[in-house]
UniProtKB/Swiss-Prot annotation:
Quaternary data: Homodimer.
GO biological process, one term: DNA repair
Positions with a binding annotation for Mg(2+): D15, A17, D189
Protein name: Phosphonoacetaldehyde hydrolase
Originating gene: phnX
SUPFAM superfamilies referenced in this protein's UniProt entry, alphabetically: HAD-like
Biological role stated in the UniProt entry: Involved in phosphonate degradation.
Catalytic residues (positions): D15, K56
Amino acid sequence: MNYNQPATLQAAILDWAGTVVDFGSFAPTQIFVEAFAEFGVQVSLEEARGPMGMGKWDHIRTLCDIPAIAERYRAVFGRLPSDDDVTAIYERFMPLQIEKIAEHSALIPGALQAIAELRGMGLKIGSCSGYPAVVMEKVVALAETNGYVADHVVATDEVPNGRPWPAQALANVIALGIDDVAACVKVDDTWPGILEGRRAGMWTVALTCSGNALGLTYEQYQALPAAELERERTRIEQMFEGSRPHYLIETIAELPAVVRDINARLARGEMPQGN
């Protein structure tokens, strides 16, 4: 049997918060701030957004490794935060996250239409998240009431290593029966999610405006003056440079056009690993 390069995409693997739901990715960021505050440690929204896309325990560990936050922790507890301390914060974070996830569960404008168009082009819809399974159960149920059902969902604690490792994306490939990683496109609003797709050998699409990096509500995004939006886009594109996304678009509403372009590139023999 000979190897044949894929001629078209077979699946889109979509992130959740900031990509399909929760414009601005507010649900996780605000809860990180609140969880640290319950331990007497101040963390700003901007700081909380930094590692977004990682699994939530890893996210908290990364925050605790930031020198300024570590020093604030030392000022309260007289020591630097250990893994046990990270687990304690995580265990406070989880019930807060489950309790408040519904407050930021609205679908991103244009998401349903874009996903329907992808299905019309023959793509399966996989998905993964930095949320653990106990949170994803609620996120998935809320999305279903709004009309969105992915073909497969992989939570961060359902694989040995979460983002930026490729395990969640590859778990989707296996579950969806995709025969080539180059026939997949990974869509995410964070650099760990783009690295995940890159390391899995997939096409990657970074979202510059709907998610964590811009950090605004849809209404605030719509109201931004053109010059300010352009400055923000430039800043966010620079933030993504290290993860090397194949495409950058503002929101998932623009994804069908990207899929058509990728299909044209595949038909010409191009592969994601070579770009």
